Amino acid sequence: PNEVCTQLHKCQLQQKPRWNRTPLRRRVYSTLRYTENVMAGRLFESARRQMLHLTEPFSTAQELTANGPKADVYMTGSDQVWGPMEDGSYDPVYRLTFAPEGAKKVAYAASFGCTELSKPLRGQFCRDLRQYATITVREDSAIALLHQLGLEGKQVIDPVFLPDDAFWQSLLEPINAAPGSYFLVYQIHKDPALCAYAKAAAKAAGKPLLRLSASVYQATWGGKFIYAPTPGQFLHYIKNAACVITDSF
C-alpha cells in the first residue's frame, strides 16, 4: 500500500517570536490558542487517518534514517516541499535524504516556494536532487531553478486537478447553505484591504458573506464566521458559493 510519511519539524513546535519572549507571554499564547488548536487538530487528524495510510510519526531525521519506512519508491510532493520552514531553515528530509542508498526517488509537482537559492543551498539541493530518478515540478520558476542546478525536470499540474468531479463530490459533507446563496471568503493572511473588499463585494451582490477559518480571531474580520469546518464541509462551502474570495490558491 501507499504510505504517507509523517514528520514533525522542530520549528513547528516553537511559538511565534512575538509570543516567545517571556514565560508569561508563552503561557498567554498557549492558553489563547489551546482550544482552537485542539479542535482544528482533531478534525484534521481524523480526516488524515480516514483518507491516508500513515506511517508512525517521526520527529527527527535521525529517527527516519534509522527506522524509516521501507518502500519500492520514495516520493516527494507536492506543493512547497522544498521551501523554507517557519524558522527559515531547509529540511533535507523533504529531499528524501533518509531513504536507503540506491532507493528510487521521484518528485511530483514539487515547489521551491522561492525563485532563487543561496550558493550553499544550491550545492545541497544539487547533491540531493541528483539522486532522484524523475523530478516534476509545478511552476515555471521551479523549472528555471532546476536548470540553474544543472538538473532536468518536467512541469505538471497540481495533484488537486488529477481526480475527476465524482471524486470531489464523494467527499462532500452536508452544510446549511444553499447553492449560489452567498459569497465566501477564505483568508490566510491578515489584510484589512482584503477584508473590506470581501464585505463590499458581497454587499454589492446583495448576498451574505461567509468566512471559513480554523482561527478564532478571524471572527472579527467580517462576515458570518464558520469555525473549523471539516474537509468535506469546506469543499461543500466552496462548491455552493456564488463567489469565492481568497488570498490562497
Predicted region positions:
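A short helix/loop element that forms part of the nucleotide-sugar donor recognition site in Leloir-type
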Residues: 167-177
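An anion/phosphate-binding loop that grips the pyrophosphate of nucleotide cofactors and donors
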Residues: 71, 132, 241
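Conserved donor-binding/catalytic core segment of Leloir-type glycosyltransferases
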Residues: 176-189
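Donor nucleotide-activated moiety binding/catalytic core segment of transferases
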Residues: 153-161, 165, 214-247
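Aromatic- and Gly/Pro-rich donor/ligand-binding loops
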Residues: 2-127, 174
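A conserved, positively charged/aromatic
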Residues: 126-131, 238
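A short beta-strand/loop micro-motif in the catalytic core of glycosyltransferases
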Residues: 132-139, 244-245
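Catalytic donor nucleotide-activated moiety binding site of glycosyltransferases and closely related
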Residues: 104-114, 142-145, 187-189, 193-231
